[in-house]
Amino acid sequence: KGRSFLSNSGSLLRVRPFRFLFHIRIYVMFKLIRQSVLSTLCLAVLLCAAYPMLVTGAADAFFPKEAAGSLILRDGAIVGSALIGQPFSSAKYFHPRPSAAGYNAGSSSGSNYGPTSKALAERVRASEQELRAERPEGVLPVDMLTASGSGLDPHISPDAALMQVRRVAEARGLPPEAVEKLVRGHVEGPEWGVWGEPKVNVLRLNLALDELR
């Protein structure tokens, strides 16, 4: 009693060859199943509990605002996130870049148009006609003609914001110089001073615009 099947050599000698192979296969199969179950349980605990708790705890400790979603408050109420763009269509506000998802965070996506798509060409052409009302001549900002891959881009280029200064100033009855100064004050540099290009957060800019007198 207590001896394994493999160590019981006396019994094995009395078993027919095919029965011996059958028992060997059963033993190996259960051994592999046991290893697989233990590996699955260990990885589940590690990846589904320990790692998420570690990352969440570190984020809350070192980046509490970002971990909470980079939420923007106005009078104690949440008005949006600095990471998620919002649609603005009024002439009194700066407009974001086109979005194939309508800035719906629940259906984040791009247009999936190919470079030879006629629908893409028509959409870009329509955007160009609208933008020419603000910049009749010269090069238009490419970010105002193309949609982002996520459809939720919260930023536009400084050039795209400056192009809209005249319209916003006229709609609000403000001096263009004051609006332009506001835009330049909201230009964010590259991440960590290295990655990306200068940009303007549209939601932050429009909130500051409401406070401009």
Regions found by a protein language model. Give the residues of each.
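Intrinsically disordered and other compositionally biased segments
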Residues: F5-N8, L12, V28
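Extracytoplasmic/periplasmic C-terminal soluble domains
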Residues: R167-R213
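Intrinsically disordered, low-complexity segments enriched in serine/proline and basic residues
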Residues: G2-R3, G10, P17-F18
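Flexible, solvent-exposed loop/hinge segments and secondary-structure transition points
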Residues: Y27-V28, S39, C48, M53-A171, ...
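Short, Lys/Arg-enriched N-terminal segments with co-localized hydrophobic residues
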Residues: P17-V28
